[in-house]
């Protein structure tokens, strides 16, 4: 929080996104900050990167028959449930971001796709997961400018 409200909001959004896509590899070495090359001043959070261990990349074809059950077996490196993380970081901004993707569908490429059954199963699970995360109570509110710390 010492870097400011916008940094904190973006960190919270990253953690909620990780919960949405079941990112199994978010750790302290794969998110960062952008700095001014001349002054070293921190200017912004880095864009989200290193999401390769998500969207059920380890799932076998049989796992897609009941992806909801398989999803419950996935976790982050710290073994803290995605739901518990979201309970701590969910705010109005994250809820608004989730509402924008509730009906997400992958854009199909003419020739470079995962199998259609896999894409459809992931889309369905993401929709269910989005609705589930939207039911997470907002535990914090964004501080208004010039509002004193409590």
Language model features with spans:
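Anionic ligand-binding catalytic core segments
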Residues: 1-23, 28, 32-150
């Amino acid at each position: 929080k010492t870097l400011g409200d916008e940094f904190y909001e973006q960190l919270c959004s990253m953690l909620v996104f990780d919960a949405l896509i079941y990112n199994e590899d978010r750790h302290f070495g794969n998110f960062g900050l952008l700095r001014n090359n001349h002054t070293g001043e921190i200017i912004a959070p880095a864009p989200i990167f290193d999401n390769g261990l998500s969207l059920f990349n380890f799932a076998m074809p049989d796992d897609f028959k009941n992806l909801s059950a398989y999803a419950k077996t996935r976790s982050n490196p710290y073994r803290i449930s995605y739901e518990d993380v979201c309970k701590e970081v969910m705010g109005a901004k994250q809820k608004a971001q989730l509402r924008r993707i509730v009906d997400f569908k992958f854009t199909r490429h003419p020739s470079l796709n995962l199998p259609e059954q896999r894409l459809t199963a992931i889309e369905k699970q993401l929709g269910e997961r989005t609705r589930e995360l939207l039911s997470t109570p907002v535990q914090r509110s964004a501080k208004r400018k010039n509002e004193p710390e409590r």
